[in-house]
């Protein structure tokens, strides 16, 4: 709309938002939403239920942002890897695991690609760098209480994002390493729901496996069938600092359930320390 109406004030607002979003694209074209309140309906290549980012970023590229065209190129390459028999699968390993695709992903993203193809061509003169290509140490996004780390071949996301979705237990909050990625290995792990539930069944992949385990590193106590974890704690203190070439996070948290209740024995305090360097990450706790 901003482009069609030549509303440059609105375009500037959208531009700043899209530039910030681009900070969260991984070097292989994946979108990092490991920290988000609605990450339960996202997958490695982006939003499972949305059309995608390509139309808007293509207009940005045409204006003055060639790096947006590079982002589209890398993401298309990822979509291609997840497409089999003309259908886009909801995860990079679904096809190999025998998990059926949902047609929603295919028609949603086909629509986004069509919106790009009907626009005037933009010449791509050279491959542009994306923000997470650079080794910059650490960036803090205060509004979402989330840090992006880039050291050597490692990329990581650390979050204490304490905004709850309308359904509790959907995303990590209490000082969590929500994503770890390596240039050669790709994703080592990414955060999952704190407790797996089909809270929006039409927008989520059904699961038929007998055993499920959360994919977010955490401290957890199960008592009388109730999980108490630092991932659900809204009263977490996080300190980030640089020391001797390490980016360190000191986290003081509590084991609570999704309703912020402590176990029977009372308040359980924990301290977890993370140290990031070019060699990797180490985690210790008390």
Where are these predicted regions, by residue range?
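Eukaryote-skewed repeat-based solenoidal scaffolds used as protein-protein interaction platforms
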Residues: 1-5, 13-18
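Extended polysaccharide-engagement surfaces of secreted carbohydrate-active enzymes
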Residues: 9, 24-286
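Amphipathic alpha-helical segments of tetratricopeptide repeats
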Residues: 19-23
